[in-house]
Amino acid sequence: MFLHNTKFCRLASGLAGGVRNLSGQKPKTAILMLNMGGPTHTDQVHDYLLRIMTDRDMIQLPVQSRLGPWIAQRRTPEVQKKYKEIGGGSPILKWTELQGQLMCEQLDRISPETAPHKHYVGFRYVNPLTENTLAEIEKDKPERVVLFSQYPQYSCATSGSSFNSIFTHYRSNNLPSDIKWSIIDRWGTHPLLIKTFAQRIRDELAKFVETKRNDVVILFTAHSLPLKAVNRGDAYPSEIGASVHMVMQELGQTNPYSLAWQSKVGPLPWLAPATDDAIKGYVKQGLKNFILVPIAFVNEHIETLHELDIEYCDELAKEVGVEEIRRAATPNDHPLFIDALTNVVADHLKSQQAVNPKFLMRCPMCSNPKCRESKSWYRQLCSN
């Protein structure tokens, strides 16, 4: 399903070790790529889960300081087993490093006035942790830092948590006064991102026999969200829907399609239908050929490599009688996607807008006091 990428294999070992600016020049523009991350090795799984389960931006639990660590401890063996089944760890760091390196190479060519550019990786729950990367950036003393969310569609639980962690870090650490800061918080409808997803889908459609091709269900799947968060006004579901709509426009509405939600945790109501339930439901209706499209993920990780590939495309498909099911690759290092990253940043650097006004808004029913403080802090930070 996935092509062997020699460029990725050649660069991966060096990039994963933290070699991010191959020229060694002092960067003028630092680009901090924010994401949740994933454990590179199974011995990192417990701490990764512990950070997730104690992050109230990501998940809210009763007596979280006690229940969160208990859940992390209990789930560690099960999650370690899943990582072993996909090769022993998450490739998200290697992909992010490669994406950042290729993006900065292009930025140096097309935007010499803001060069040299250097990418940095800031993960929320596993090394390289965002707060440690911020210290690395400060040592490099760039003129400008762009905080670039690697979640194309914004959610308070994902993008919001990453941005709140930066606010929390500088609440107890001195903020460098000689750096200009700006934010890219959402970019889920960027034309080149849309073209990337469309091409990934075309690649998989071409593998179906021609007589079935137009009947293949394109099933977009995104990480689910608790309805409690949706009802507060989180923009995530509408932004996912916008991405789906534009991808289908790019494809020319050639196939039946739908949107489902994966990776629910716990008993409370979340967005529905669940991806596995959607597959079961369509099979009952006589639709038995599918392409799964992870519309919210820009690189491979456990939720694509295990949940989609193993649990759904392999195990579930056999169980319910699917005829043929394929999974579109995430953008990874597709040339269109590297162009998308480059264009998003280049356009941002040329603009006079340091922060999207939407980012400075809170959800209409926001109940998180940290968000109020964080938004106020970012408003001031980006006005300097």
Curated annotation (Swiss-Prot):
Binds 1 [2Fe-2S] cluster. GO terms for cellular component: mitochondrial inner membrane; mitochondrion. Its cofactor is [2Fe-2S] cluster. CDD domains: Ferrochelatase_C, Ferrochelatase_N. Pathway: Porphyrin-containing compound metabolism; protoheme biosynthesis; protoheme from protoporphyrin-IX: step 1/1. This is Ferrochelatase, mitochondrial. It is found in: Mitochondrion inner membrane. GO terms for biological process: heme biosynthetic process. InterPro entries: Ferrochelatase (IPR001015), Ferrochelatase_AS (IPR019772), Ferrochelatase_C (IPR033644), Ferrochelatase_N (IPR033659). Belongs to the ferrochelatase family. It comes from the Eukaryota. [2Fe-2S] cluster binds at residues 156, 363, 366, 371. Its EC number is 4.98.1.1. It is a peripheral membrane protein. Gene3D superfamilies: 3.40.50.1400. It holds the Pfam family Ferrochelatase. The active site is at 190, 343. Homodimer. Homotetramer. It is an enzyme of class 4 (lyase). It catalyses: heme b + 2 H(+) = protoporphyrin IX + Fe(2+). It comes from Drosophila melanogaster (Fruit fly). One of its GO terms (molecular function) is metal ion binding. Keywords: 2Fe-2S, Heme biosynthesis, Iron, Iron-sulfur, Lyase, Membrane, Metal-binding, Mitochondrion, Mitochondrion inner membrane, Porphyrin biosynthesis, Transit peptide.
